């Protein structure tokens, strides 16, 4: 996939297949790029989100858009007694997730599934998580509705995502890095310029934190937001009413 045919950004019905193809192409180097491009800070973000997801001692947790399984593995290492299921619609990512979990001798179910049509019954998970995948959904409202549907009453949703850069000096510096430095590094390491041009574009097109919180409330969640690392990342926590 080239920069010219990278996925559309924002909440768009026609981007699902393009996103699927893009992540399939970068799967082998996805983890390395995450570490390099975030300077390793993404691990701390995942730890904070895992603590929220496990706060009420869930029995079953679904990690949506699990990718190569980093967050599902974080959850299982923190709570070995909890059943963890990782779902993604990119088979190449799931293959890597299974290899990583197997190397750590962790029992995690990784299953192929579309986040907009989750293949699970109503009220079947006590917590649902999504780390840096929600931004890639073709329909944010439908994605939230599906995650609400599979949660048990009182269950918790935790979203970890990149909000648009804030205003001010730090936001300007981060925007410069995100738009001009990150795509070059990503293209060099992955060989896919389109994927790492799409990333900053998708962040800039993503809803502001309060707007996403409002969408969650409209779906039926009691919602709160926490900025991480000066707002580079954000965590939305929603409890199903």
From Swiss-Prot:
InterPro entries for this protein: SAM-dependent_MTases_sf, UbiE/COQ5_MeTrFase, UbiE/COQ5_MeTrFase_CS
Pfam families: Ubie_methyltran (PF01209)
Reaction equations catalysed: a 2-demethylmenaquinol + S-adenosyl-L-methionine = a menaquinol + S-adenosyl-L-homocysteine + H(+)
Enzyme class: transferase
SUPFAM superfamilies to which the protein is assigned, alphabetical: S-adenosyl-L-methionine-dependent methyltransferases (SSF53335)
Entry keywords, A to Z: Menaquinone biosynthesis, Methyltransferase, S-adenosyl-L-methionine, Transferase
Pathway(s) annotated for this protein in UniProt: Quinol/quinone metabolism; menaquinone biosynthesis; menaquinol from 1,4-dihydroxy-2-naphthoate: step 2/2
Superkingdom, taxonomy of origin: Bacteria
Any one Gene Ontology molecular-function term assigned to this protein's record: methyltransferase activity
EC number: 2.1.1.163
Gene3D superfamilies membership: Vaccinia Virus protein VP39
Binding site for S-adenosyl-L-methionine: 68, 88, 114-115
Gene Ontology terms describing biological process: menaquinone biosynthetic process; methylation
Family named by the database record: Belongs to the class I-like SAM-binding methyltransferase superfamily. MenG/UbiE family.
Free-text function comment from the UniProt entry: Methyltransferase required for the conversion of demethylmenaquinol (DMKH2) to menaquinol (MKH2).
Name of the protein in question: Demethylmenaquinone methyltransferase
Record organism: Deinococcus radiodurans (strain ATCC 13939 / DSM 20539 / JCM 16871 / CCUG 27074 / LMG 4051 / NBRC 15346 / NCIMB 9279 / VKM B-1422 / R1)
Gene: menG
């Amino acid at each position: 996939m080239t920069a010219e045919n990278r996925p559309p950004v924002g909440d768009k019905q026609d981007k699902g297949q393009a996103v699927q193809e893009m992540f399939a192409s970068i799967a082998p180097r996805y983890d390395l790029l995450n570490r390099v491009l975030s300077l390793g800070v993404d691990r701390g973000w995942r730890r904070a989100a895992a603590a929220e997801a496990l706060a009420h001692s869930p029995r079953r947790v679904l990690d949506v858009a699990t990718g190569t399984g980093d967050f599902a593995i974080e959850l299982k290492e923190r709570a070995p007694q909890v059943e963890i299921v990782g779902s993604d619609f990119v088979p190449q990512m799931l293959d890597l997730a299974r290899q990583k979990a197997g190397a750590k001798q962790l029992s995690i179910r990784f299953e192929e599934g579309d986040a907009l049509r989750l293949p699970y019954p109503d009220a079947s998970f006590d917590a649902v998580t999504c780390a840096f995948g929600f931004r890639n959904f073709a329909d944010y409202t439908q994605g939230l509705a599906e995650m609400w549907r599979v949660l048990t009453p009182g269950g918790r949703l935790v979203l970890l995502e990149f909000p648009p850069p804030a205003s001010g000096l730090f936001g300007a510096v981060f925007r410069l890095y995100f738009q001009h430095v990150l795509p070059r590094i990503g293209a060099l390491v992955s060989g896919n310029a389109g994927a790492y041009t799409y990333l900053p574009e998708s962040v800039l097109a993503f809803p502001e934190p309060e707007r996403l919180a409002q969408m969650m409330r409209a779906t039926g969640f009691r919602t709160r937001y926490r900025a991480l690392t000066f707002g580079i990342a954000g965590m939305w926590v929603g409890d199903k009413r």
